[in-house]
Structure formats: C-alpha cells, structure tokens
Swiss-Prot record:
Family: Belongs to the aerobic coproporphyrinogen-III oxidase family.
The protein's annotated pathway: Porphyrin-containing compound metabolism; protoporphyrin-IX biosynthesis; protoporphyrinogen-IX from coproporphyrinogen-III (O2 route): step 1/1
UniProt region (Important for dimerization), positions on chain: 266-301
EC class (word): oxidoreductase
Gene for this chain: hemF
Subunit text: Homodimer.
Entry's Gene Ontology BP terms: chlorophyll biosynthetic process; protoporphyrinogen IX biosynthetic process
Full protein name: Oxygen-dependent coproporphyrinogen-III oxidase
Residue sites binding a divalent metal cation per the record: 102, 112, 146, 176
Species this protein is from: Prochlorococcus marinus (strain MIT 9515)
Length: 342
C-alpha cells in the first residue's frame, strides 16, 4: 500500500478530529453532571478557523477546554521550515484537536491531549499524544493511564509505544526546573512513515536509542491515521476511571494550595517550551484558544520546599521524574510502603 496520503486526506483527518472533539465534550458533560460546554466558532483571516469549547465551574472540572482548528495559508512559520525545509514555498494545511482538563479536586490529575495532521506540498505528517499531570501521587492511576495508551499504540504496531513513551518524557520536560511536567504518556511528531520513528533532536535520550534499535517500521498513511484514531479513542478509558476513583476524596486547604502551586509549573511549560503554543502564536492563531490550556488559577511561592517524606515531597521527587511506571518492581514496593500506590 502506498505511503502517500489519499486524495481526501484533509477531509478525512478533519472529520476524525471533529468527531473526537464531539465525543470528548459529550462524555465530559455527562461525567461532570453540572456544567455544559460553551462554543465559539472563529475564523482566521489568512485562512481557516475552528471551534473552541470551554466548560467552567463544573462539579468536577474547574475548567475544561477542547479545541478544534483547521487552518491553512501560503507562508509557513519558521518553526516548520527549520524542521522540514522541503516544505518551503508550498501552501500548507493543518488540523488538530487539543484538550486540557483542570479538575477542582487535587487528587484528580490534569490531563492533556492533542492529535494533529499537517500537509505542505510533498510534505505531510501526523503528530499527537496524551499526558497526565498528577498533583498527588498514586502509582495505580499512573499505570492505568499508561496501559490504556500502550494498548492503543500496539493495535497499530507493538514497537511504537517503546519510542512514544520516552519521547513524551523528553518533550514534557521543564529544562529550567530540571523536572517533568507530569508522569508522561505518549508523544509523537513528524510521522510520515519514512525513516526511524523518533524525529526529535536528543541523540542521547532513550527515545532515540529505542528508535535506532527498532529501525524503520514502514508505516503508511492509513496506519498513522489509525494510530490517531485509536489513541483518541483511548482517552476516556484512560482517564474516566481515575476521576471515578478520586472524586469523592475530601481535600484540605493545604492540599488545594499545593495543587495551585504545581499548576504554576504547567503554566511555565506551556508558555516557555510548548511547540504548539509557539506555532499558534507565530501563525496568528486565535490567542484565546491557544492559551486555553492555562489553568484558571495558579500560584507561585519563592523557595518552596515540601516537608520531607510528605506526599507533596514524594510527588516532587518521584512523580516529576521519568520512570518505568508499568514494570519497575522497586518503584512499586516503594509506593506500597509509602501509601502512594492506590
């Protein structure tokens, strides 16, 4: 089967991502039980547009944003040209659905999802992923999230998750803090079926090493479309059980304050390091939609240090570091001993 996109590639990916947005919003409204999404449709002067949906002040979600966009133009931003110079001079098309959920309860993690598709002349690729940012450490929740996304990847190829997991650890890393944004998940970009899976720049990282060991997988357009479809569908099964397990847990003012403090790291990553934010701002995207990922409340505290051995301390020391969450028996024993397994 040809690796090249079908003639209806743009319409097909657009419809997939619209359906993903609709499905997520419908289910999140049912889960929350109180608030509803409001929708704003918008147009981009240079070409394209989208629809932004936001749910605020729900029973579970303090804020939830689910965006769809379909944009196109003639002038590519420098961030794309530097990665794929052969795209220069071609008209381009990009579509994507992105989501960030900020729950009220500190025991329910923040979650992020993004799946996207890009074309410019002979150049095309899929990208995407999902990642979890807990504020309090529970290894069982982390394992469940990773397992669901591992299963979704393996439906296309059993080797994909071996690269996408460490690639996610690498991408969602705050270099200025020397810590991960959360416990990771999956991340992939520039996937067009050619070359090795890993397309990042860190040749010292585990994603690069795993990708080199695996070699080329010869995936075609349909395989990569199915990957986006499978992973998008895995979101609810990866996250809803965590909500159901944690939503009835009472929390203190201090635990809420720690959640807001850790949300500050989320803000720092999105404004300083996130390529999607940078791309959106460089291409004159809709600013309100681009910054929808930011939490409604966050706080910073100079020189904060958690009490040694506290759950806040264990979150900071262990759950902001890349780990083999699913298979590390030493980590499992440590979490059981310190009451942070379940």
């Amino acid at each position: 089967m040809s690796k090249e996109p079908p003639n209806n590639s743009r319409e097909k990916t657009k419809n997939l991502l619209l359906k993903l947005q609709d499905n997520i919003c419908k289910n999140l409204e049912n889960i929350d039980g109180k608030a509803k999404f409001t929708e704003e449709s918008w147009l981009r002067e240079e070409g394209g547009g989208g629809r932004s949906r936001v749910l605020k002040n729900g029973s579970i979600f303090e804020q939830a944003g689910v965006n769809f966009s379909e944009v196109y133009g003639k002038e590519l931003p420098q961030s794309i040209i530097s990665q794929r110079p052969e795209a220069k001079g071609h008209e381009w098309f990009a579509t994507g659905t992105s989501m960030v959920l900020h729950p009220k309860n500190p025991f329910i993690p923040t979650v992020h999802l993004n799946y996207r598709y890009f074309e410019a002349g002979p150049v095309w690729w899929f990208g995407g992923g999902a990642d979890l940012t807990p504020y309090y450490p529970y290894l069982s929740d982390v394992r469940h999230f990773h397992k669901e996304h591992s299963n979704a990847c393996e439906k296309v190829n059993k080797k994909l998750h071996l690269v996408f997991k460490p690639w996610c650890d690498e991408y969602f890393f705050l270099k200025h803090r020397n810590e991960s944004r959360g416990i990771g998940g999956i991340f992939y970009d520039y996937q067009d079926g050619s070359g090795n899976i890993y397309k990042g720049s860190n040749k010292d990282g585990n994603a690069y090493k795993e990708s080199n060991n695996i070699g080329e997988l010869n995936l075609n357009w349909n395989n990569l479309f199915a990957l986006a479809e499978n992973c998008g569908e895995a979101f609810l099964s990866s996250y809803q059980p965590i909500i159901e397990k944690r939503v009835s847990q009472n929390y203190t003012k201090e635990e809420r304050e720690f959640q807001l403090y850790r949300r500050g790291r989320y803000v720092e990553f999105n404004l300083v390091w996130d390529r999607g934010t940078i791309f959106g701002l460089q291409t004159n995207g809709r600013t309100e939609s681009i910054l929808m990922s930011l939490p409604p409340l966050a706080r910073w505290e100079y020189g904060y240090k958690a009490k040694q051995g506290s759950r806040e301390d264990l979150l900071t020391k262990i759950f902001t570091r890349p780990q083999d969450w699913q298979n590390d028996k030493v980590l499992e024993e440590f979490c059981l001993e310190n009451n942070i397994f379940d």
